[in-house]
Curated annotation (Swiss-Prot):
The organism of origin for this protein: Oryza sativa subsp. japonica
Effect of a null allele: No visible phenotype, but increased tolerance to an excess of zinc.
Induction: By zinc deficiency in roots and shoots.
Family: Belongs to the ZIP transporter (TC 2.A.5) family.
Taxonomic lineage: Eukaryota, Viridiplantae, Streptophyta, Embryophyta, Tracheophyta
Annotated Gene Ontology cellular component terms: plasma membrane
Any one Pfam family match given in the protein's UniProt record, by short name: Zip
Cytoplasmic-side positions: 70-86, 143-198, 252-260, 314-332
UniProt keyword annotations, A-Z: Cell membrane, Ion transport, Membrane, Signal, Transmembrane, Transmembrane helix, Transport, Zinc, Zinc transport
Name by which UniProt lists this protein: Zinc transporter 5
Record's function text: Zinc transporter that mediates zinc uptake from the rhizosphere and may be responsible for the translocation of zinc within the plant.
Length: 353
């Protein structure tokens, strides 16, 4: 049910961005002049087609690596290697929010093409990012609390219906259960972690998909080869690293295979689909139109708030504060190095992307 609800949210966001932006971009006028020097639609289109396949491959491999890596004991969840990889992914997601997305939101909402209105009189990008982070916290805690309350009621009803003579044997037997794929079939401690990971993975995917859609449409709408060419490798690595971060969270959530494939496909296809939409609207799309700037800025700011919260609270803090990590200096050092490496590499990509 949760995956189906997330699917509807993703589809709705895609339709809003794909239909609302181009419909208003052509109608709006702006004093900002558009430079036509270097425009070559044919060459740009060839580069966009290459970008679709490169980004699709990079996204798919990145999202699939954590799941496929589960076949190898060294990189299964809670191992030292997995924790280091997850720290690297947390750095990638944090840099995505703070270095890639949030500055773009401020730039869009402070553009000289936004004449009139409240956009230049108040830092809306920062406020929207803050509200988005707080909203993510609320969704995170409310969803987790709901699952816990529902499970507590189910257990209370099961205990009430069970004969008194069987309670002791049932209690002893329950401690021998192994962790399963279902939330209802795991031991209490593991169940709490599993619920948290499932909420984390779905909220994180929401923020990643919003950002992926926007960058895909921006690339697809450009007719300048000089702009598109460096974005092809930059966005391929960008999506690859993001895929590793998202894939690691999905692995820990222990979804069924169908749900894992669905979430991975949504992530992998969003940017290529955004490029296709951008190609379709390139003749009417004006990136400097007030409506396009406002919609892009608000969506980018909201996505930044989600990703920054998820990276700091649900990915990095959760693992760095574990007793296992605190007691082992080498593991702590490895995770810190991985964190800095992930954040540094993703920040470097901002030079081209």
């Amino acid at each position: 049910m949760a995956t189906a609800a997330m699917t509807k949210v993703f589809v709705l966001l895609f339709l809003v961005a794909a239909c609302y932006l181009p419909a208003h971009a052509a109608a709006a006028e702006c004093d900002c002049a558009t430079d036509t020097a270097g425009r070559d639609k044919a060459q740009a289109l060839r580069l966009k087609v290459i970008a679709i396949f490169c980004i699709l491959a990079g996204s798919t491999v990145g999202a699939a690596l954590p799941s496929l890596g589960g076949r190898f004991p060294a990189i299964q969840p809670e191992t030292d290697v997995f924790l280091s990889v997850k720290a690297f992914a947390g750095g990638v997601i944090l840099a995505t929010g703070l270095v890639h997305i949030l500055p773009a939101a401020f730039e869009a909402l402070s553009s000289p093409c936004l004449v009139g209105g409240p956009w230049k009189r108040f830092p809306f990008a920062g406020m929207v990012a803050m509200v988005s982070a707080i909203g993510t916290l609320i969704v995170d805690t409310v969803a987790t609390g709901y699952f816990h309350r529902t499970d507590a009621k189910r257990k209370a009803a099961a205990v009430a219906d069970e004969p008194a003579d069987d309670l002791e044997a049932s209690d002893e037997h329950s401690h021998g259960h192994a962790h399963g794929m279902s939330v209802m079939s795991v031991a209490p401690a593991g169940e709490e972690d599993l619920v948290r990971h499932r909420v984390i993975s779905q909220v994180l995917e929401l923020g990643v998909v919003v950002h992926s859609l926007i960058i895909g449409m921006s690339l697809g709408a450009s007719d300048f080869p000089s702009t598109v060419r460096p974005l092809v490798p930059a966005l391929t690595f960008h999506q690859f690293f993001e895929g590793i971060g998202l894939g690691g969270c999905i692995v820990q959530a222990k979804f069924r295979v169908r749900s894992v494939v669905t979430m991975a496909l949504f992530f992998s296809l969003t940017t290529p689909a955004g490029i296709v939409v951008g190609i379709g609207i390139s003749s009417v799309y004006d990136a400097n139109s007030p409506t396009a700037l406002v919609v892009q800025g608000l969506l980018e700011a909201a996505a930044a708030g989600i990703l920054v919260y998820m990276a700091l609270v649900d990915i990095l803090a959760e693992d760095f504060m574990k007793t296992k990590v605190q007691r082992r200096g080498r593991l702590q050092l490895a995770m810190n190095v991985a964190l800095l490496l992930g954040a540094g590499l993703m920040s470097m990509i901002a030079i081209w992307a």
